[in-house]
């Protein structure tokens, strides 16, 4: 029989997480975060902590995976948490392995952010851009175009509060939601 290691998924009150999303491993989801159907959040190499007010759209993949040169369970690897700040947007079909992400970032459709990239705050990774460097992206950087050109914007992207409010109202009408955590962590006996 397959090994059953269902790690904990903690969903804060006020978060909207559709049942059709795939969440594996030790994942903590903050309040006012919206996770669409078909979004995937996979914590293999350590926990994933998602802050408040994030929007994770369809077919977005957020994965805390083992680096390519490490074979799990054979080497003594310390689990490293992936930390995602507040008010970030993961658009349709994006792929993020960034271990540390600040606030107010946007990863646009089909964009890829590698494991060794640190996104500070206010950054936009443009559609179809691939970023797999060993660097911390400076605040308010926009990476765009087929050549992944860079520039710095004067203001950081606006939080998607109106869109989050709309989705929190509409998604429960059309999708089943995963249950959020209650005040106590002990199971209730019938």
From Swiss-Prot:
SUPFAM superfamilies: Trimeric LpxA-like enzymes (SSF51161)
A Gene Ontology cellular-component term: mitochondrion
Induction (record text): Up-regulated in Ant1-deficient mice.
InterPro entries associated with the record: DCTN6, Trimer_LpxA-like_sf
Domain of life: Eukaryota
Compartments reported by the entry: Cytoplasm, Cytoskeleton; Chromosome, Centromere, Kinetochore
Signal keyword on record: no
Entry keyword annotation includes Zinc: no
Posttranslational modification: Phosphorylation at Thr-186 by CDK1 during mitotic prometaphase creates a binding site for PLK1 that facilitates its recruitment to kinetochores.
Gene3D superfamilies noted in UniProt: Hexapeptide repeat proteins (2.160.10.10)
Biological process according to GO: lipid biosynthetic process; mitochondrion organization; mitotic spindle organization
Assigned keywords, A-Z: Centromere, Chromosome, Cytoplasm, Cytoskeleton, Kinetochore, Phosphoprotein
GO molecular function: catalytic activity; dynein complex binding
Modified residues (Phosphothreonine): 186
Similarity comment: Belongs to the dynactin subunits 5/6 family. Dynactin subunit 6 subfamily.
PANTHER family in the cross-refs: DYNACTIN 6, DYNACTIN SUBUNIT 6
Function: Part of the dynactin complex that activates the molecular motor dynein for ultra-processive transport along microtubules.
Subunit and partners: Subunit of dynactin, a multiprotein complex part of a tripartite complex with dynein and a adapter, such as BICDL1, BICD2 or HOOK3. The dynactin complex is built around ACTR1A/ACTB filament and consists of an actin-related filament composed of a shoulder domain, a pointed end and a barbed end. Its length is defined by its flexible shoulder domain. The soulder is composed of 2 DCTN1 subunits, 4 DCTN2 and 2 DCTN3. The 4 DCNT2 (via N-terminus) bind the ACTR1A filament and act as molecular rulers to determine the length. The pointed end is important for binding dynein-dynactin cargo adapters.
Protein name per the record: Dynactin subunit 6
């Amino acid at each position: 029989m397959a090994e059953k290691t269902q790690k904990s998924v903690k969903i804060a009150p006020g978060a909207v997480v559709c049942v059709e999303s795939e969440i594996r491993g030790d994942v903590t989801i903050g309040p006012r975060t919206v996770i669409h159907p078909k979004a995937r959040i996979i914590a293999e190499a350590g926990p994933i902590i998602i802050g408040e007010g994030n929007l994770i759209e369809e077919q977005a993949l957020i994965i805390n995976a083992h680096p390519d040169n490490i074979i799990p369970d054979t080497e003594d690897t310390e689990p490293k948490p992936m930390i995602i700040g507040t008010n970030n947007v993961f658009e349709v079909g994006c792929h993020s392995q960034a271990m540390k992400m600040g606030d107010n970032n946007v990863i646009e459709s089909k964009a890829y952010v590698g494991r060794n990239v640190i996104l500070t705050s206010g950054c936009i990774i443009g559609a179809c851009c691939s970023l797999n460097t060993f660097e911390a992206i400076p605040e308010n950087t926009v990476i765009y175009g087929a050549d992944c050109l860079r520039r710095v914007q004067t203001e950081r992207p606006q939080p998607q509060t109106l869109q989050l409010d709309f989705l929190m109202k509409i998604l429960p009408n059309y999708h089943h939601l995963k249950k959020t955590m209650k005040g106590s962590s002990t199971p209730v006996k019938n």
